[in-house]
Each structure stands twice: as structure tokens, then as C-alpha cells.
Curated annotation (Swiss-Prot):
Mg(2+) 2 binds at D217, E389, E393. Its cofactor is Mg(2+). The gene is ilvC. GO terms for biological process: isoleucine biosynthetic process; L-valine biosynthetic process. Transmembrane segments: none annotated. NCBIfam families: ilvC, PRK05225.1. This is Ketol-acid reductoisomerase (NADP(+)).
């Protein structure tokens, strides 16, 4: 099979990369009615599989789970989760032939095997759903022409999808129809009903494409969402300890610092995050972020180039075929780092202390968010898509580090995200070491003293922060998410 994106001509590539439309709430007036009375079979009962299924059932849909015979016979975790929540469970052969919509929510590396197994069992005219388009775009999976192929991609982990639904809300969601597989022209109706059934329409839905979702998702997770947080954690911890900070305190400042800092980001964008600093600290954080952007821009561009060309995907799939040798080696090495093995700090760190002593961390967040956003937009991805794949998801990933450091982040994210994270962080850490060596007192671990600032300089910096394109689009999109709960509880 050939990478689907690479089979398109340039005009088609640009059209699909640039497909992005914020949908009005009135477009979801019918809710999930298009799928009511139809059979929806979910393959996979992980975090997305279970929680989307719970929401869809609560929205009045007929949901069951198709699992492998071995998973049922051995009563594995997927079988237990589905049955304990009262769902009908059966084998592929028992459930797939009756399904009107088969939703594939297994991990990326299992998609080809799953799709090749279920396709012959699917009835004529059925629909196949994904929550990530890697299998279609990067693997180039060929789907029977009578089958409609759609995507509903919540921009949150599965647990958040469920919790926001239970609160009567939802999470921002991308939906798409594969242009090669919409024989009856009903793909958008199916995708809208599925999104409404998960609650996504209450938080904002973007009509996107499989291509735009995949390319932007890969870029975000590799760079700012995971790679930058991992590289920043390792670099900042080593710098603090090198300068005599208690390793336990240093570890806590970083582990919970990302979460606390990005909670401000979630509520009010880069503007609010920077406003939490004193004026002298804000000017310093801005200067550091500009230096970081200049240093890291080529690395961000390389990741985007490799994602667009398919180089990243082909390398990762080669590692799949080699039993994940690179992935598992990098995972083991990360677990042995000084940050991951540092003792726990039992003392209290106040919320403002994370900002005052984390000026460099704030600069890293600002630089990483803006670079990821700018690089995606420069590659043809529309601003709304770039926002969701950079700034929006960052607090959610930071929250995983607050739970169990980098180990938890890498367990929770997909193997695809984890592989890309290691590629980025392994390149970024040595790239930034000369920069780290030139830091000044107050950049990390100590507060910058209050003092006089130049009013004109402060005015210009504030204008530069607020006028960035990500702040403009973010203000609009956050207007649809005002009811989402706080994530951070600083340690």
C-alpha cells in the first residue's frame, strides 16, 4: 500500500491540508438521531473505546463491542471493561455483519490487522469510523468502495471525553469524511451524529479532513505536546541540580510546574500565562522565548517536513516491524533519567511560586506553542486546527506528568505519539544545552527581583504577545469551552 497523501497531486494535498471549518451549533440540531435505531459496533475497549461508547449509549444509541475470540475466552481487560459496564460483547464474526457503523478504536499499529479482518465481514453499504486517520493517510489502507469512511476525533483523552459529557458538556472535536469513500453521500450525517452522541458539539466541532487531522496531530504531539515537555523536564531538572537545588524540590517544581503554568494557558492563552509574571519576569520570559524560537525553528520545521513527506511514518512503521526495538529502548532510557528517579519532595510549593521560579519553563511553553502553531500554518494547515493541536491539548498532557512524571505521559499517549516524542526530545536536549549554559540567575529556580521596567518596552512586549495569531484564534475557540472544568491541582 502507498501513503495516501503522497498519491495526491499538489492541489489536492493543499486542499485537504487546508480543510477546516468551524461548525455552527445549529448544524447539530438533530443531535444523534441519524444513528438512532442503527447498530454501532466498537472494536477496541481502551480509554477512547470505552468512554466514547458510554457517551454514545447515554445518547440513545445501540452500542456493542466486538473483541477477538482470545480476549473474550481469557476475559482480558477489554472484555471486563465492556461487560462490567453492561455492554453486549461478541466476536467479530458475531457482531460485525449486523453493524451499520463499525468504529475502530484500537491503537494505530493494530489498525491494518483489524481493518483487514472486519472488512470482509461488513455488510454492503455499512460505515467504518476512526478517531485518528493514520491508517487511512499514512498506511494508505484501501477500503471497499461501498463502505463509507468517517472520522470523529475528540481533542482530549478518553477519560476527559466521558467526564465532560457527564457534566453536560463535551470536548472539542474534529470530524471528517474520507473523500474516496462516501458512496451514498451520507458520511457527514454519520460523523455529525457520532460527534453529537459523544457530546462534542457542545464544545465546538471543526469540519476537517483525514489528511489535516493526521498531519497536524502528529506535529503537535511530537513537538510542543510531548517532545517539548519531555526535553524541557530533563533539561530544567539537570540545570537546577547542577546549580545546587535539592533534587526532590527540583523534581516537584518541574513535575507540577508544567500543569500549573498551562492551566493559565488553558484559561486565557499565552497572554494570561505571561500576565502571571511580574513585569521584569515577563520581559525576561519573552526574551528567552524569542531566543528559543530562533534555536528550535529548524527542528520544528524538520519534524513538519518529515510528517508531510511520510518519512516519519515510514520510519516508525519499520520499527513496528522490528518489534518496537527503538521505542522500547528509548522508553527504558527515559525511565533511568535523573528526573524520573529523583526522590519525592514532601513540602508545599505555592501556586505563584511555580510561576516566579519557572520563568524558563514559561518561555519554553510560549516558544513551543508558537513554533508548533506557526510551522503548521506555514505548511497549509488552518489556524483553528493548529490551535487545537498545540495550545489546547497542552494542559491535558501536562496533567499526566503531574500524576507520575514522564512515565505516565508516555503510558497515556499513543505509541505513535511516544515514538515521535522521543525523536524530538533526543534531538532537542543536545540542541539546547549551549543555551542552558548561558542562563542568568532568576531564569529558573529563583525569582527575578521586582524592579523598574521600561514602559515602552513593556508595552511593545504586551502587544506582541496579544497580537500573535494563536491568541486571536484562541480567544474565539475558548469562547466555546467556557464550561470545561479546571484540570490543575498544584502539588
Amino acid at each position: 500500500m502507498a501513503n495516501y497523501f503522497n498519491t495526491l497531486n499538489l492541489r489536492q494535498q493543499l486542499a485537504q491540508l487546508g480543510k477546516c471549518r468551524f461548525m455552527g451549533r445549529d448544524e447539530f440540531a438533530d443531535g444523534a438521531s441519524y444513528l438512532q435505531g442503527k447498530k454501532v459496533v466498537i472494536v477496541g475497549c481502551g480509554a477512547q473505546g470505552l468512554n466514547q461508547g458510554l457517551n454514545m449509549r447515554d445518547s440513545g444509541l445501540d452500542i456493542s463491542y466486538a473483541l477477538r475470540k482470545e480476549a473474550i475466552a481469557e476475559k482480558r481487560a477489554s472484555w471486563r471493561k465492556a461487560t462490567e459496564n453492561g455492554f453486549k460483547v461478541g466476536t467479530y464474526e458475531e457482531l460485525i455483519p449486523q453493524a451499520d457503523l463499525v468504529v475502530n478504536l484500537t491503537p494505530d499499529k493494530q489498525h491494518s490487522d483489524v481493518v483487514r479482518t472486519v472488512q470482509p465481514l461488513m455488510k454492503d453499504g455499512a460505515a467504518l469510523g476512526y478517531s485518528h486517520g493514520f491508517n487511512i493517510v499514512e498506511v494508505g489502507e484501501q477500503i471497499r468502495k461501498d463502505i463509507t469512511v468517517v472520522m470523529v476525533a475528540p481533542k482530549c483523552p478518553g477519560t476527559e471525553v466521558r467526564e465532560e459529557y457527564k457534566r453536560g458538556f463535551g470536548v472539542p472535536t474534529l470530524i471528517a469524511v474520507h473523500p474516496e469513500n462516501d458512496p451514498k453521500g451520507e458520511g457527514m450525517a454519520i460523523a455529525k451524529a457520532w460527534a453529537a452522541a459523544t457530546g462534542g458539539h457542545r464544545a465546538g466541532v471543526l469540519e476537517s479532513s483525514f489528511v489535516a487531522e493526521v498531519k497536524s496531530d502528529l506535529m503537535g504531539e511530537q513537538t510542543i505536546l510531548c517532545g517539548m515537555l519531555q526535553a524541557g523536564s530533563l533539561l530544567c531538572f539537570d540545570k537546577l541540580v547542577e546549580e545546587g537545588t535539592d533534587p526532590a524540590y527540583a523534581e516537584k517544581l518541574i513535575q507540577f510546574g508544567w500543569e500549573t503554568i498551562t492551566e493559565a494557558l488553558k484559561q486565557g492563552g499565552i497572554t494570561l500565562m505571561m500576565d502571571r509574571l511580574s513585569n521584569p519576569a515577563k520581559l525576561r520570559a519573552y526574551a528567552l522565548s524569542e531566543q528559543l524560537k530562533e534555536i528550535m525553528a529548524p527542528l520544528f520545521q524538520k519534524h513538519m517536513d518529515d510528517i508531510i513527506s511520510g518519512e516519519f511514518s515510514s520510519g516508525m512503521m519499520a520499527d513496528w516491524a522490528n518489534d518496537d526495538k527503538k521505542l522500547l529502548t528509548w522508553r527504558e532510557e527515559t525511565g533511568k533519567t535523573a528526573f524520573e528517579t529523583a526522590p519525592q519532595y514532601e513540602g508545599k510549593i505555592g501556586e505563584q511560586e511555580y510561576f516566579d521560579k519557572g520563568v524558563l519553563m514559561i518561555a519554553m511553553v510560549k516558544a513551543g506553542v508558537e513554533l508548533a502553531f506557526e510551522t503548521m500554518v506555514d505548511s497549509g494547515i488552518i489556524e483553528e486546527s493548529a490551535y487545537y493541536e498545540s495550545l489546547h491539548e497542552l494542559p491535558l498532557i501536562a496533567n499526566t506528568i503531574a500524576r507520575k512524571r514522564l512515565y505516565e505521559m508516555n503510558v497515556v499517549i499513543s505509541d505513535t505519539a511516544e515514538y515521535g516524542n522521543y525523536l524530538f526530545s533526543y534531538a532537542c536536549v543536545p540542541l539546547l544545552k549551549p543555551f542552558m549554559a548561558e542562563l542568568q540567575p532568576g531564569d529558573l529556580g529563583k525569582a527575578i527581583p521586582e524592579g523598574a521596567v521600561d514602559n515602552a518596552q513593556l508595552h511593545d512586549v504586551n502587544e506582541a504577545i496579544r497580537s500573535h495569531a494563536i491568541e486571536q484564534v484562541g480567544k474565539k475557540l475558548r469562547g466555546y469551552m467556557t464550561d470545561m472544568k479546571r484540570i490543575a491541582v498544584a502539588g
